[in-house]
């Protein structure tokens, strides 16, 4: 591998699966995928839970780091652990494992990992996923006045144009598949994508998000050119969404007859 080329590693870490992306940053918008995969480090049953983390770290080193350490990897992005669990022991275990994998990357590759939250990774990788929240958690449309106000205020949220129950990881995997149609995804016997595909695609999202934030700077969204057409009980609200040097035209269709408690 040419030492002058910028080879970047990215990891999405959980104690059961490590999503891995190895990419050649060739200056293009998305780079070239060298490897997009996952590692499921298996240890014997009844292994002490603390020792298991050390064993899994060794498996990751043997199955991936040692295999690719000669590629001249120059950077490593790691998705920062999402500390939303109510189980403090689960959070502590994830933090420990994340730190152990980070240390393995540093020791084996001589690269200091860079961390990015899942929220920032998704927002910077695919800003077009930011949208006006149209539906509540009960999947019912918000009232017209609330939606119109959020458009006027430019209040965009991640996955805002999707229903609350949307499988976010599936949306991200589909976007990665669109960018790299040559990737061979893994399916089960029912023809369904296995969940480890999502760990792999999350690793790419972390990498792309980190690169985009560095390339284009902090991202700020604004809305302009708001116009509205009514067709009976339906309102068609059109507007432009601005971020970086890009403009995306959006249209939101709203049923004006909906009445509900907007706090839900």
List each model region and its residues.
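Phosphate- and other anionic-substrate recognition elements at nucleic-acid/protein interfaces
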Residues: 1-264
